[in-house]
Amino acid sequence: MYTTSILTFIFATISVAFFTYRIVQKMKKSDNATEEYFTGGRALTWPIVAGSLLLTNLSTEQLVGLNGDVFGDKALVGLAWEALAAFAMIATALIFLPRYLASGFTTTPAFLEKRFDKTTRSIVSGLFLFGYVTVLLPVVLYTGSLALKSMFNINISLWLIVIIIGSLGSAYAIFGGLKSVAVSDTINGVGLLIGGLAIPFLGLSALGEGSFLNGVSILLNDKPEYLRVLTRTNLDESIVSVPWPTLFTGMMFIQIFYWSTNQVIVQRAMAAKSLAEGQKGVLFASAMKLVGPLMLCLPGIIALHMSELPIGRQDQVYGAMVRYVLPDWSLGLFAAVLMGSILSSFNSALNSASTLFSLQFYKGYINQNASGEQIVKIGKKFGVFIAIASMMIAPLLAQTQSVFQYLQKVNGLYSVPIIGIFLLGISTKHVPAIAAKVGMFVGMAIYAFFSFENLHNVHPFFADASGDLHWLHGYFISFVSAIVVMLVIGKYKPKTADEIAISDQRDSTPVDMTPWSGSKKASAGIMGMTFTIYILLSLVAE
């Protein structure tokens, strides 16, 4: 890296920290220490909710992983991860968020305690923590380090970069709380939107030998099959990572898990100052997800047309593209933007993990009389512990072929049972707590079978590239099995009328529960735009 790039990187990173500090100091503070630290005092407005949602999700595990998958697929099927996310976010805004806010919950598992029992909440909280420590946090650290290393060809150990990023992210989350995390997310989000969109623009210009329009023409006319969004196989007749049948099985449910029940994501919306502000933020973020493929998929497609890029494995595509198209003077600035997205996802997951441990396990079992200050103190200590654990695990991910597929597959082990009990908790009243527990373990066991043994030589319609049952179909079968088990138990051993009455009781909520009047129209518009994008790309790829 040149001196100018280093100075630009340092200046931009410090500037974000400075403006975050100034903005947070001016925001309304809650007298409740726990509420202030873990939900930002419930003072977030819709732009901050939207910005934090987007940047928590839009990080290097997406930029590196999804662009790599698109490149490896030689097709645009990865668009489904963004398009169906928009649908799941609509469900969050209209269905899940009103139920979470109605009782003033601080965590999503708290809803399960109300609907089922404390043990169910504890099991789900434990599963979330397992996922954050073994999957989400290490993946963010690994992909972030890999992106920075490949962008600048830095001759530094991956371990060292992981430690640097992990330490910086920990400082935001542990010492600043959710409010600092959300504000820094919003500031970094603006930079990432500008910088992220610049990469495909410059890539198309480079493809067109200096002409953006020529680049677009090449993209549309030279092997337009690369733009297929609904297909099972690519030009090489290889089965792609997201065959179109999976859109109607596991894909939709894994999106609902991530956007509607995952503590890391939903905690931002739960910190909104009112239901209307939360719905506006979630739906604006949903609309912006439709812009996401320009950053998360298009660079991978452009790279397919650029044989001169030095790409050893597919997860190196994004870093190679950035290094190829950006002028030297701007590398430091983009590195700061990328660092912001890395820190955002890392510190968001860290804050959510601290929230779950402190409120569920420490307050719930270890010290039930703990004060707000004690809970926050323990949360910070636990944050340090899992930050160190994730830094130790992250470099081990270098052994995986596709880090994005690793993220989604391992997530399935605990998300299958979680999404099932959340959906039944919202849609039914008679399913008892024992059904939730049995259903969770049945779902996990069946998904574990598909992950480690699987069905071999299945019909091509249901197969992955190796001929085994595609993992998203396995996810769907596991999910349906868990639901069936819970419903059967609920039929023969339903809740009593008294138990249902207790579940229906609502605690007081600290926020205004008036919904946003434009939420349904906005949702319809987002769905219409999604279908239009699919139709247009399908026509172009023919």
Region annotations inferred by a language model:
Residues 1-542:
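Membrane-embedded helix-loop-helix hairpins and adjacent transmembrane boundary segments
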